[in-house]
């Protein structure tokens, strides 16, 4: 593993770096799954959010907002863009949907031999994204006491765009509740 995985359900999912609790999964919970490994010495990082049974309508709405924010950022990502400008693509969309204050972290980070490397893709930085770098695109919305949603993929930055290194589905998967 390239880092300790995060498996955070229900209200614990509203904590971006949640730690395990003894709270059992409940029908309607969203579960944030953040995990990664190493391949040939290089780290990986991916996050998906799944539902246990049928989530509340607000959770489905937030999921689709995060998914669209990520889609827009993936489309805009390319070498030569600044980290702040790329972060702004997702952050602006989330803000327009009324959840700006609930997107509390930067959009992503570099990944290489270590899980968190330069550049930091954030509203706090103004670095130019270099060709050949691998960065994460991971917008999230976190509603304290309720749930969180984060969707993360790694991309290879190129002068004319970004190549997604993930092929897994981003559809909201509903796992049957026990």
Predicted feature locations:
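Active-site neighborhoods and metal-handling regions in enzymes and metal-associated proteins
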Residues: 1-178
């Amino acid at each position: 593993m390239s880092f300790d995985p995060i498996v955070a359900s229900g209200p614990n999912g509203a904590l971006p770096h949640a730690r395990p609790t003894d709270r059992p999964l409940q029908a309607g919970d969203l579960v944030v799954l953040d995990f990664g490994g190493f391949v040939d010495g290089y780290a990986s990082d991916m996050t998906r959010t799944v539902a246990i049974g049928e989530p509340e309508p607000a959770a489905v709405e937030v999921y689709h907002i995060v998914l669209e924010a990520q889609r827009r950022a993936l489309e805009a990502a390319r070498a030569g863009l600044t980290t702040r400008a790329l972060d702004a693509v997702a952050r602006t969309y989330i803000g327009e949907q009324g959840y700006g204050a609930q997107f509390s972290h930067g959009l992503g980070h570099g990944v290489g031999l270590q899980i968190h490397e330069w550049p930091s893709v954030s509203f706090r930085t103004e670095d130019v994204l270099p060709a050949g770098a691998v960065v994460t695109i991971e917008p999230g919305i976190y509603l304290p006491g309720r749930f969180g949603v984060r969707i993360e993929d790694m991309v290879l930055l190129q002068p004319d765009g970004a190549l997604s290194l993930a092929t897994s589905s981003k559809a909201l998967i509903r796992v049957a509740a026990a």
